[in-house]
Amino acid sequence: MINVTLKQIQSWIPCEIEDQFLNQEINGVTIDSRAISKNMLFIPFKGENVDGHRFVSKALQDGAGAAFYQRGTPIDENVSGPIIWVEDTLTALQQLAQAYLRHVNPKVIAVTGSNGKTTTKDMIESVLHTEFKVKKTQGNYNNEIGLPLTILELDNDTEISILEMGMSGFHEIEFLSNLAQPDIAVITNIGESHMQDLGSREGIAKAKSEITIGLKDNGTFIYDGDEPLLKPHVKEVENAKCISIGVATDNALVCSVDDRDTTGISFTINNKEHYDLPILGKHNMKNATIAIAVGHELGLTYNTIYQNLKNVSLTGMRMEQHTLENDITVINDAYNASPTSMRAAIDTLSTLTGRRILILGDVLELGENSKEMHIGVGNYLEEKHIDVLYTFGNEAKYIYDSGQQHVEKAQHFNSKDDMIEVLINDLKAHDRVLVKGSRGMKLEEVVNALIS
């Protein structure tokens, strides 16, 4: 993490610091006054309900090395210690992160996409970690606050920084890309997330493609070549190498399934390189192909990439498998959802042997298209050989309505507890249960009830 003096910070960003404090060392950054450790820099924000400047005095008393303070904000008479006066604390955080990133000077890999950002980030880290010192975004620290905080967690000897970039509207990824100036930019796919803000999948593709705006000259852009909506934006990328991945044969890296079972999927790249992935889902084959492309660009050997992918582990609640007694498999894919990722989950479940039980919750943030898209997920069940469909949530009722005719058994629930009770009583040996819904639905509670 960042470990510099206030004098160094003063040379990096517009600010004022009393001379007597310039030799004070800073070790780490936090925006949470409850998480202060010795010599941390505390950064307060003015929120709608709470002004973080109220906690500056306590942060300093608790051992903070210094604190940002926004000019024009009344200062408590109890504040005593190193204060860094700035025009705006958020802007100063972002400026500090950009300066520190230049100081550390790692190769930056930026990852965005409607689905699979975190999974792809995890896979890239797995591919690279034996050859480089790698640091990646933790959790969903992928916005205008989280990304700078991630950068400030880099150690001085970090060689690769993998930065996840999220957004809910236009120009947000453009800002993050300009801040981070990636060497490699990645778009995993285009789905329907944030449709209510961006209006259409075309709008989502445009917003995601902003990741190339800050791409360094002679950088690399890796993208889902199976997505037609990205092609117009690829043509706008200048002074960069563009690499398409996907199942279509016109891609630079063509991935094709060799075999799959309850332990994962085996696939081949360009009919030459064979890989074994211990994760379910054809969509994860494409995420892995992106990681392979990154490995190629950074000069890794086939054997290194193969071994590292074979041992990949993902952030929780992404196709996370639990094996219960009597050969029952529960797949926790409940971290988040979109119609696209739900269809991918259905495809994955349909390839497994045993009775296939699908548990789906609402997909949120779809705006006026929500009903139509939930109906579409239900219709997608046709000829997918799903045996049981359980749904929960107001919007998921539309999945039930359109999907019940395509399964042997279906039931919609208004209570999560009721669904859990029915499911537990219904489980049989060799069942395969897949659970998916938007983050706000908290369907991991269903998984926890099954595995506890």
From Swiss-Prot:
Q: Where does ATP bind?
A: G113, S114, N115, G116, K117, T118, T119
Q: Hey, what's the signal peptide range on this chain? A: none
Question: For this protein, what reaction is catalysed?
Answer: UDP-N-acetyl-alpha-D-muramoyl-L-alanyl-gamma-D-glutamyl-L-lysine + D-alanyl-D-alanine + ATP = UDP-N-acetyl-alpha-D-muramoyl-L-alanyl-gamma-D-glutamyl-L-lysyl-D-alanyl-D-alanine + ADP + phosphate + H(+)
The effect of pH on activity is described as:
Optimum pH is 8.4-9.0.
What subcellular compartments does it reside in? Cytoplasm
Q: Name one GO biological process term.
A: cell division
InterPro entries associated with the record: Mur-like_cat_sf (IPR036565), Mur_ligase_C (IPR004101), Mur_ligase_C_dom_sf (IPR036615), Mur_ligase_cen (IPR013221), Mur_ligase_N (IPR000713), MurCDEF_CellWall_CoF430Synth (IPR051046), MurE/MurF_N (IPR035911), UDP-N-AcMur_synth (IPR005863)
Presence of the UniProt keyword Translocase in the record: no
Q: In which pathway does it act?
A: Cell wall biogenesis; peptidoglycan biosynthesis
Q: Where is it mainly found?
A: cytoplasm
Entry GO CC? cytoplasm
* Top-level taxonomic group: Bacteria
| Annotated Pfam families | Mur_ligase, Mur_ligase_C, Mur_ligase_M
Q: Which UniProt keywords apply?
A: ATP-binding, Cell cycle, Cell division, Cell shape, Cell wall biogenesis/degradation, Cytoplasm, Ligase, Nucleotide-binding, Peptidoglycan synthesis
Q: Which GO terms describe its molecular function?
A: ATP binding; UDP-N-acetylmuramoyl-tripeptide-D-alanyl-D-alanine ligase activity
What biotechnological or industrial uses does this protein have?
A: As MurF has no human counterpart, it represents an attractive target for the development of new antibacterial drugs. A new series of cyanothiophene-based inhibitors have been designed and synthesized, and identified as micromolar inhibitors of MurF from S.aureus.
**Enzyme Commission code:** 6.3.2.10
Name the protein family.
Belongs to the MurCDEF family. MurF subfamily.
State the function annotated in the UniProt record: Involved in cell wall formation. Catalyzes the final step in the synthesis of UDP-N-acetylmuramoyl-pentapeptide, the precursor of murein. Catalyzes the addition of D-alanyl-D-alanine to UDP-MurNAc-L-alanyl-gamma-D-glutamyl-L-lysine. In vitro, can also use the mesodiaminopimelic acid-containing form of UDP-MurNAc-tripeptide, with the same efficiency, revealing that the discrimination for the amino acid residue at the third position of the peptide in the peptidoglycans is entirely supported by MurE.
Q: What is this protein called?
A: UDP-N-acetylmuramoyl-tripeptide--D-alanyl-D-alanine ligase
Q: Which organism is it from?
A: Staphylococcus aureus (strain NCTC 8325 / PS 47)
